[in-house]
Amino acid sequence: MHDDQILLTWVPRLRRYARALAGNRDDADDLVQDTLERAWSRASLWRGSGEVRDLRAWLFSVMHNLHVDGIRQPKLATVLMDDDTPEVAVAPTQGERLAVIDLQGALDLLPIEQKEIVLLVALEDMSYADVSVTLAIPIGTVMSRLSRGRERLRALMEGRDEPVRLKVVK
């Protein structure tokens, strides 16, 4: 398989994660393009040198870092058009559409540290170890952020402002 074909096999997963991070199709496509450009410009790292052992984790790390850099840098305001067009072939029911809108809104309320981990584990089906490598954080941090993120999502989806706190019994 050629190098460009290897990278192209990852585009759907990168795009899905980028869309969840960025919140709209245009920014997600820009993020995927920047990720692929970075990967191609550093092809010697993953092509044969062995420096990159897990291409998937490395690509998601690159995307994560580019996304964080993009958040830090002020952007010019852009007008997004036609972002509400569904990408699925079968139209969802009204209830499904509302559930997705509610979930997206709840995800947007999560701190970015929790949101990224929830998306990588739930949407991209990454293991805790892979997320740890991708985000360059300890696996315990992955587990605690995931737990807090899931609980916060649950609370938001149930209409509660705050997650239920367990009482400490002495």
Identify the function of each model-found stretch.
Residues 77-104, 127, 167-169:
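Internal acidic/polar
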Residues 45, 60-82, 96, 155:
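Arg/Lys-rich amphipathic alpha helix in sigma70-family domain 2
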Residues 1-16, 26-29, 40, 44:
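A short, charge-rich alpha-helical start-of-domain segment used by transcription regulators
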Residues 36-40, 51-73, 146, 150:
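Σ70-family region 2.3-2.4 aromatic/basic alpha-helix that recognizes the −10 promoter
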Residues 24, 127, 136-141:
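Helix-turn-helix DNA-binding motif, specifically the short coil turn and the N-cap/start of the second
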Residues 117-121:
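A short pre-motif secondary-structure segment
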Residues 2, 133-136, 151-170:
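C-terminal edge and immediately downstream basic/flexible tail or linker adjoining helix-turn-helix-like DNA-binding
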